[in-house]
Amino acid sequence: MQIFFPKENEFESRVSVLPETVNKLVELGIDVEVEASIGKTLHISDDLYTSFGASISKDRDSSLSSSDVICRINKPEKEEIRLIKKNSIHISFLDPFNEIELVEEFARSNISAISMELIPRITRAQKMDALSSQANLGGYAAVIEASSCLSKSFPMMMTAAGTISPCKVFIIGVGVAGLQAIATAKRLGARVEAFDTRPEVEEQVKSLGARFVQIDIGETEQTEQGYAKELSKEQIKMQQEGMKKVCAQSDVVITTAQVFGRPAPRIVTMEMIEAMKPGSVIIDMAVSNGGNVDGSISDEHVIHNGVTIVGLSNLPGKVAFDASLVYGNNLFNLLEEYWDAENKELNFDLSDEILSGCVVTHDGDIVNAMVKDRI
């Protein structure tokens, strides 16, 4: 069986596989091919990939049309899907709820498409959960980005020239990204507060040394996979009123709120921004999914009323080597789980709990229940 790892687009600093992961795949008995210069953004040479057992492809189209499995980070262009051979497997982030035409093209082309966003959040699948591995690094990168935009230091400093008070950081949304943002801001010495619509995360916030902000918005729920469910308009308004005072007292606000399969909720309004101190910084981690913050623009720094609003669509790419490392490990763990060493192929059983959750198309049909519900 041959796996092909193509280069990502010009805007992506991460790569889908590092040489060390190539070695692990080769040891399973898999033929690994990577596109020439795949590691250029990380200053990794083709020679290093070959030393770990990979073949180098200088003809992307030919490799796409001849490989049994194609692994990448970002979704392909629709035209590229038509190059991929029938009955092969394609694995990447696909954004299937917003890319229905792409999903339909995979089905028409008779390609089994696995969406890494849809890996179930169950214990057995944790090692394959790329959404969490990337969100974790994104939370770290968000705090580092905020510190570089802020004209204050994060920790308290007691000097002969006077005492510098610690930076106040407010994290909205306590999922994987939010928890890492809390931990990173605390390690940098900031005073941290956090809010989430799920009251059950309060203990996690406190365990990291942060204060959980209590805002009564009535009864809230979460999905089976642990994501917050969408709030009503009344609940969002109550939430915004409760957060306005906290934002006004904060030097940094980081929003991480996402609703699985839906546009990100608009949480920080222009009214809240205008109540904040000049020089404050807002990091909108949900900007690529519609954004949590009024006025945030993807991959731009916007200054409004003295407040810097930062919307970065690829925060894990700020720590591209580590993001590539863990993503490659996620892919390897997924492939290893279903590798049939005797027959040298993947055992594709859709009755399996993980595969039934993440396989979007198979045998010419859209087979994922959640995606089918959105068509």
Residue positions per predicted region:
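A structured beta-alpha segment of the ubiquitous adenosine-cofactor-binding alpha/beta core
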Residues: 54-68, 75-76, 222-253, 257-270, ...
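Adenosine-phosphate binding glycine-rich loop
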Residues: 117-118, 123-160, 287, 293-375
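Glycine/threonine-rich flexible loop motifs
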Residues: 12-16, 79-83, 92, 226, ...
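Glycine-rich phosphate/diphosphate-binding loop of Rossmann-like nucleotide-binding domains
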Residues: 7-44, 155-246
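Glycine/serine-rich phosphate-binding loop and adjoining beta1-alpha1 elements at the start
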Residues: 2, 8, 78-168
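An N-terminal-biased, well-structured beta-alpha scaffold segment characteristic
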Residues: 1-105, 109
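Rossmann-fold NAD(P)-binding glycine/threonine-rich loop
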Residues: 97-123, 262-316
